[in-house]
């Protein structure tokens, strides 16, 4: 049975057989095809002549216009169809019920009892809430119920052991505690330490943020750069007395040339380090001392003295070429390493921690320069000599306390660790007026430096006098 479709709309719609509609459509297509076939044949015969006359642009525009007309004719001949369907009540799409978006058909909708569905949805929503409320009620007595002392004793041993169990420590927490303990972060002493760098907080050259790390590095590396305390054994022509004479003379030259204090301590270090590595003849010892001071001046001073100045001071005992040659030999032997922690660096820090006055400063440097002259003081590290010099100066001046917690914190040394070195320094002070090397004693006897060498040595640190034979 042939299908039928309603053409038009409303009450006047007429049913047209589908077979008749197909026949009319085919005839129209044949007529259009014949028309355009004739058109394109004629157009093809004359395209050369028109191309020459009108140009390629106009010809192409005409050709495109013909194609557009053909397409418009095809669109215009299509009839407008309207499908009349039985009137049905409007359907409201339920969520997730029909997502097919069908055009020519309808998806089968499930028959749902809305009251039952709403009740089921409400039950589903209430069940989790009810379950959570029950859990809360079950857990609530464990929080608020307080057991009596008698009930606590009734607990089994496993429960008592679990209650006494220490909290679990992770690897990160253990490593953090070890690191803080090694750096002194959790040390109880640090809470009592006065900030000696507070006054320099606005001074960028003081590097307050790094000063603790710098001096910790100095203390850790000072033994690496220390000269040998037994190098005199390998020297064949010089001895301790000759070294003392040379150092005493260099202190006088340093004072007359008004050089920086750092230059003096670096000069003595260079001499001792070079003598630890090289066997020096007796006649070249002064040349080594002059060349070492020239190197230290170039390293520390803003305006270093000239070579001829040292030649004049040494009474022209050697030539300019000898000084420069020895200077090069020393630098090569030391591998050009002049950045070392000297005694002077530690003294500056320890005096700051001592919170003393100018007199304490002069007395400390007096003991430090006495230590420079004596070869036997090489047995002690520079940081130990610096701390012992501060301790001996406080003992000599009668300051109290002799050694504070602040000094112990910044030096890392307790009072018993300083006694041996401090006793040697005070003994040198007691013997200075009668010693042959009196430059240091006379230098610090001047009022300009507080005449600190004229103070009586600390009797507390002097050895007891030997009994007088009857």
UniProtKB/Swiss-Prot annotation:
Q: Which UniProt keywords apply?
A: Cell cycle, Cell division, Cyclin
Name a GO CC annotation attached to this entry.
Answer: cytoplasm
Biological process GO annotation list?
Answer: cell division; G1/S transition of mitotic cell cycle
InterPro entries attached to this UniProt entry: Cyclin, Cyclin-like_dom, Cyclin-like_sf, Cyclin_A/B-like, Cyclin_C-dom, Cyclin_N
- UniProt GO MF annotations: cyclin-dependent protein serine/threonine kinase regulator activity
**UniProt xrefs under Pfam families:** Cyclin_C, Cyclin_N
In terms of superkingdom, the source organism counts as: Eukaryota
The UniProt similarity line reads: Belongs to the cyclin family. Cyclin AB subfamily.
Q: What is this protein called?
A: Cyclin-B1-3
User: Which species is listed as the source?
Assistant: Oryza sativa subsp. japonica (Rice)
């Amino acid at each position: 049975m042939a299908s039928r479709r309603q053409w038009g709309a409303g009450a006047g719609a007429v049913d047209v057989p589908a077979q008749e509609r197909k026949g009319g459509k085919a005839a129209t297509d044949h007529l259009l095809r014949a028309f355009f076939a004739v058109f394109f044949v004629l157009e093809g015969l004359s395209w050369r002549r028109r191309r020459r006359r009108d140009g390629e642009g106009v010809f192409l525009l005409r050709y495109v216009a013909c194609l557009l007309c053909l397409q418009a004719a095809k669109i215009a001949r299509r009839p407008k169809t309207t499908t009349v369907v039985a009137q049905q009540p409007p359907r409201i799409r339920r969520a997730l019920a029909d997502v097919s978006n069908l055009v020519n058909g309808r998806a089968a909708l499930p028959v749902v009892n809305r009251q039952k569905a709403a009740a089921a949805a409400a039950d589903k929503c209430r069940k989790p809430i009810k379950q959570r409320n029950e859990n809360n009620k079950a857990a609530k007595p464990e929080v608020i119920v307080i057991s009596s002392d008698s009930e606590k004793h009734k607990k089994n041993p496993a429960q008592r052991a679990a209650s006494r169990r220490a909290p679990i420590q992770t690897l990160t927490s253990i490593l953090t505690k070890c690191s803080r303990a090694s750096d002194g972060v959790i040390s109880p002493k640090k809470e009592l330490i006065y900030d000696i760098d507070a006054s320099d907080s606005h001074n960028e050259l003081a590097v307050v943020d790094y000063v603790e790390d710098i001096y910790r590095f100095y203390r850790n590396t000072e033994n690496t750069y220390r000269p040998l305390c037994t190098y005199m054994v390998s020297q064949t022509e010089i001895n301790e007395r000759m070294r003392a004479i040379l150092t005493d003379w260099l202190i006088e030259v340093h004072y007359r040339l008004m050089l920086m204090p750092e230059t003096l301590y670096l000069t003595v270090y260079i001499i001792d380090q070079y003598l630890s590595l090289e066997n020096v003849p007796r006649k070249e010892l002064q040349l080594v001392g002059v060349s070492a001071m020239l190197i230290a001046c170039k390293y520390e001073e803003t305006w270093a003295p000239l070579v001829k100045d040292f030649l004049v001071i040494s009474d022209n005992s050697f030539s300019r070429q000898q000084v420069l040659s020895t200077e090069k030999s020393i630098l090569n032997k030391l591998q050009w390493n002049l950045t070392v922690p000297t005694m002077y660096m530690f003294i500056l820090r320890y005096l700051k921690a001592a919170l003393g006055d100018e007199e304490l400063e002069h007395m400390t440097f007096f003991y430090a320069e006495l230590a420079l002259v004596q070869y036997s003081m090489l047995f002690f590290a520079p940081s130990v000599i610096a701390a012992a010099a501060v301790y001996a100066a406080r003992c000599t001046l009668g300051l109290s306390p002799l050694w504070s917690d602040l000094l112990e914190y910044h030096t890392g040394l307790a009072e018993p660790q300083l006694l041996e070195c401090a006793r040697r320094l005070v003994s040198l002070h007691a013997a200075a007026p009668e010693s042959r090397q009196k430059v240091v004693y006379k230098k610090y006897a001047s009022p300009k430096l507080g005449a600190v060498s004229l103070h009586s040595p600390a009797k507390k640190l002097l050895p007891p006098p030997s009994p007088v034979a009857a």
